[in-house]
Design a protein with these regions (language model features):
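Short, mixed-charge low-complexity intrinsically disordered segments
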Residues: 36-64
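Short aromatic-glycine-(Arg/Gly/Cys) micro-motifs in beta-strand/loop hairpins
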Residues: 1-16
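Short, surface-exposed loop and linker segments with low hydrophobicity and enrichment for Pro/Ser/Thr
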Residues: 1-3, 35-38
């Protein structure tokens, strides 16, 4: 079973939870889609590992 990853959008009021997605690859795809359709900064958070990736309309940054 895939782990669940939460996608957040960065807002001036702090992080806004968008959705929970099963599987890291699917979460990255969904985050990229969100960044293209609703520009802004997004990040993926894992309960186990914390923030693992950030996405803007321009690029994806993987967090080691």
């Amino acid at each position: 079973m895939d782990s669940i990853y939460d996608i957040f959008k960065v807002t001036s009021n702090g992080p806004l939870w968008i959705e929970a997605v099963p599987g890291l690859d699917r979460a990255k795809e969904q985050m990229a889609y969100l960044a293209l359709t609703s520009p802004g900064e997004y990040f993926i958070h894992s309960q186990e590992h914390g923030v693992i990736a950030k996405q803007t309309q321009e690029f994806l940054e993987e967090i080691p």
